[in-house]
Amino acid sequence: MAGALWGFFSVLLLLLSGDAHSSEVPGAAAEGPGGSGVGLGDRFKIEGRAVVPGVKPQDWISAARVLVDGEEHVGFLKTDGSFVVHDIPSGSYVVEVISPAYKFDPVRVDITSKGKMRARYVNYIKTSEVVRLPYPLQMKSSGPPSYFIKRESWGWTDFLMNPMVMMMVLPLLIFVLLPKVVNTSDPDMRREMEQSMNMLNSNHELPDVSEFMTRLFSSKSSGKSSSGSSKTGKSGAGKRR
């Protein structure tokens, strides 16, 4: 009786172990390159090197990171500035080297389903323009980033180009220089200037510009005539003597 029970249990254990082995084999095949899941053959790596001209890699790589499509994949730099980002499926990715002390231009890497790599510049303005880059990537720093805008220094040009200053200076220059440039003794010219000033002076509460111009020109002409008459009078008196 004991022998029969022992034989029954041994046969049952053999059957259970066979079922477990048969259930594990298809799962392992599914995870391989030919299975339905994503295996190691469908994953690739992005390689490259980051360089800062004139600076040793040990001075800046500790705070730098390599980002692929934002923070979807993150890589770290080695002591010589090289980096490898593993476990990346096929597709198009933007690779960036982020450092608080130095700025690097991003690079787009296209990975085909067969593992062929193609690197190019990232151009957000002209997306159709393709400028090829060598692979593995050679990312060179363009200098320190500018976190602050430099304050503009004060200059005389800023003062002179101020609208308030121009509104005060230009009319003064016109009133001072215009009588010297224009022939004020010509009555026709004077009449045209008075008419143009009256057209500009539409507000009746303001002083009449034409009256001001007339007084200005008449005072000059009367001064000239009086000086001329005084000279002629003196010359006539001298002749009489």
Swiss-Prot record:
Entry's Gene Ontology BP terms: protein insertion into ER membrane by stop-transfer membrane-anchor sequence; tail-anchored membrane protein insertion into ER membrane
Query: Region (Disordered) spans which residues?
Result: 216-241
Membrane topology category: Single-pass type I membrane protein
| Cytoplasmic side of membrane | 180-241
Q: Where in the cell is it found?
A: Endoplasmic reticulum membrane
Question: Compositional bias of type Low complexity: which residue ranges?
Answer: 218-234
The UniProt keyword set, sorted, is: Endoplasmic reticulum, Membrane, Signal, Transmembrane, Transmembrane helix
- Molecular-function GO terms, alphabetical: carbohydrate binding; membrane insertase activity
Question: How the protein assembles, per its UniProt entry?
Answer: Component of the ER membrane protein complex (EMC).
What is the protein's name according to its record? Endoplasmic reticulum membrane protein complex subunit 7
Q: What species is this protein from?
A: Mus musculus (Mouse)
What lineage is this protein's organism placed in?
A: Eukaryota, Metazoa, Chordata, Craniata, Vertebrata
